[in-house]
Structure formats: C-alpha cells, structure tokens
C-alpha cells in the first residue's frame, strides 16, 4: 500500500499514526522492522502473517494468531482453559510471583503461557499446543506442563498426531523444582504417544530455549523451525565464557541447527499449514469424515 493510498483510506479519520519499533509493541499504524528497518503499514504486515515483506523477518505472533494460521476455520476446540497457576513457594524478587501472574493474565487475556486443544488441518485431526511468549516469556511452569501433558494424553487416547509450537525462555524459576519436573512429565507422556506409533512434531519459533529445548522441543519425529529462530539451551555469552571461544555468527539459529542435523526442516510461516497437511497425509492421517465411517 502506497502512502497516497493509505492517506486516502485514513482521510475520514484524520489521524496520523506513530511508528512502533516492534511488530508486537504498541498499536502504532506503522511498524519498523527490527532486522532491516523497513517501515511497513501494520495492516499490511498482519496480512502477511507478521512477516516483513522486505527481508522476510518473522515477527513474534500470539497464540490466537498462530492457531488461526494452522487450524481450519472454526475447527479449534480448546481444552483446560480454566487452569491457572498459583504461588506454591511464595516467591518474591523485586515483585511477588503472584503479582507477575496477575499482570500477565491482565495483559494477555490468558490464564497461563500455553493454549491447547484439538483442531483440523485440511480436515485432518491434529492435537495442538501453542506456547505464548507474551505470558512471562513463555516460561514453563506447572500449569503449562500440565496442559501440555493433558493434550498429549488426549492425543494418545484418540490416536491423533500432535504439534507443539514452542516459544519459551525455559523453565519458570518462580516455581523452582515444580517447573523443572515438567520436563520429565511431558517427555514421559510423549513416550507413551510414541509407543502407539503416533506422530509428534515440535515447531521451534523465536525463541526456544532452556528447559523447553532440553526436553520436548527436541523429541519430535519431525522437528520443524521458523526461519532465523533462536534455538538453544544456555545463552551465547555463557557458552563463550565457559568455552573461552568465539562462536559462529549464526550459532543457535534455525539455519545452524538444520545444517548440523538438529532440525529437519525450516518452514516459512506462509507455508506452514500446507506443509503440515502434506506431512499428515504422508503419515496416513485420515480426514475426520473418513475416519468416522
């Protein structure tokens, strides 16, 4: 959309929008790409799946946007939406954990950092868990772990494949050992899913780090990733200081992991649904109408 077209569209409102520095920041009508500094009209960016049309940078998107990209229209049925975290340790740093929970819930409209449910992709069933980085950095606490475990168990019971969209800074430190045990719990549920020869795919988005990477994010039959996603366990600076070596510029990117065999395929956001449908079909997943006959 050109400037002339934009002003024509906005003339009745007589409003000049500010430029946001990030696609998920504020409500400015214009957004500056954090990679190439190209300024884009926010509506155009949204219509392009929040991907910069100039350099292809994939901006963060929330769980609702992700579900709309993956699932057939009106097919997503959410489960366990009322599960909400508590503060079992009475944890407090500069602020209490309880206050941080309330703030994140108010800011995102979510109870915790993952949305789970069943949907269809081109009429084929798929169990889906989508982590949302807006909620305390997508950190994995007891509720996140419980919801992911429950959707895996449901997928195992109903013989459905599962996709987990990973976007996380790792285990939630405010819950201590309770958060760390989610790594084993989810991994155990995935083992039972695998024993039934069912398909599990993690989609690694920016960022996927810490305990999430060290557990279910790397246990897939087919590991997908978005372009240039940050994927790793410890931070780059920590590794460099420990090894006393300079790491490659593209270290811990999706492309680096693909080159070294830790990721199977990098999928652009616009191609995600088509790619998932092909994978499901290749693995013999039947359409819901066919499966019920």
UniProtKB/Swiss-Prot annotation:
Residues 29-293 form the CoA carboxyltransferase N-terminal domain. Pfam families: Carboxyl_trans, Zn_ribbon_ACC. The keyword Transmembrane does not apply. It is an enzyme of class 2 (transferase). It catalyses: N(6)-carboxybiotinyl-L-lysyl-[protein] + acetyl-CoA = N(6)-biotinyl-L-lysyl-[protein] + malonyl-CoA. The keyword Transmembrane does not apply. One of its GO terms (biological process) is fatty acid biosynthetic process. Zn(2+) binds at residues 33, 36, 52, 55. PROSITE patterns: COA_CT_NTER. A zinc finger (C4-type) spans 33-55. GO terms for molecular function: acetyl-CoA carboxylase activity; ATP binding; carboxyl- or carbamoyltransferase activity; zinc ion binding. Its main location: cytoplasm. It is found in: Cytoplasm. Binds 1 zinc ion per subunit. Signal peptide: none annotated. It comes from the Bacteria. Its EC number is 2.1.3.15. Keywords: ATP-binding, Cytoplasm, Fatty acid biosynthesis, Fatty acid metabolism, Lipid biosynthesis, Lipid metabolism, Metal-binding, Nucleotide-binding, Transferase, Zinc, Zinc-finger. Gene3D superfamilies: 2-enoyl-CoA Hydratase, Chain A, domain 1. One of its GO terms (cellular component) is acetyl-CoA carboxylase complex. InterPro entries: AcCoA_carboxyl_beta (IPR034733), Acetyl_CoA_COase_Trfase_b_su (IPR000438), ClpP/crotonase-like_dom_sf (IPR029045), COA_CT_N (IPR011762), Znf-ACC (IPR041010). Its cofactor is Zn(2+). Coiled coil: none annotated. Acetyl-CoA carboxylase is a heterohexamer composed of biotin carboxyl carrier protein (AccB), biotin carboxylase (AccC) and two subunits each of ACCase subunit alpha (AccA) and ACCase subunit beta (AccD). Belongs to the AccD/PCCB family. This is Acetyl-coenzyme A carboxylase carboxyl transferase subunit beta. The gene is accD.
């Amino acid at each position: 959309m050109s400037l002339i077209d934009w002003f024509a569209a906005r003339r009745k409102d007589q409003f000049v929008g500010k430029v946001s520095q990030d696609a998920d920041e504020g409500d400015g009508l214009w957004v500056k790409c954090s990679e190439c500094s190209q300024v884009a009209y926010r509506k155009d960016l949204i219509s392009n799946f929040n991907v910069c049309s100039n350099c292809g940078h994939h901006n963060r998107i929330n769980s609702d946007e992700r579900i709309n990209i993956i699932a057939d229209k009106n097919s997503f049925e959410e489960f366990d939406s009322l599960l909400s975290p508590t503060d079992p340790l009475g944890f407090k740093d500069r602020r209490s954990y309880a206050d941080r929970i309330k703030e994140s819930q108010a800011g995102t409209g979510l109870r915790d950092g993952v949305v789970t449910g069943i949907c269809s992709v081109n009429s084929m069933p798929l169990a889906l868990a989508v982590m949302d980085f807006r909620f305390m950095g997508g950190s994995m606490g007891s509720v996140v772990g419980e919801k992911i475990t429950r959707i895996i168990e449901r997928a195992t019971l109903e013989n459905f494949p599962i996709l987990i969209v990973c976007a996380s800074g790792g285990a939630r430190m405010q819950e201590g050992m309770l958060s760390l045990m989610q790594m084993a719990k989810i991994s155990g549920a995935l083992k039972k899913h695998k024993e039934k020869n069912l398909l599990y795919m993690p989609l690694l988005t920016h960022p996927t780090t810490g305990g999430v990477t060290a557990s279910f994010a790397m246990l897939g039959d087919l590991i997908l990733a978005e372009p240039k996603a940050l994927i790793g366990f410890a931070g780059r600076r920590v590794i460099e200081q420990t090894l006393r070596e300079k790491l490659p510029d593209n270290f811990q990117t999706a492309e680096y992991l693909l080159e070294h065999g830790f990721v199977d395929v990098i999928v652009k956001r616009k191609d995600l649904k088509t790619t998932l449908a092909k994978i499901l079909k290749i693995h013999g997943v039947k359409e819901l109408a066919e499966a019920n006959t």
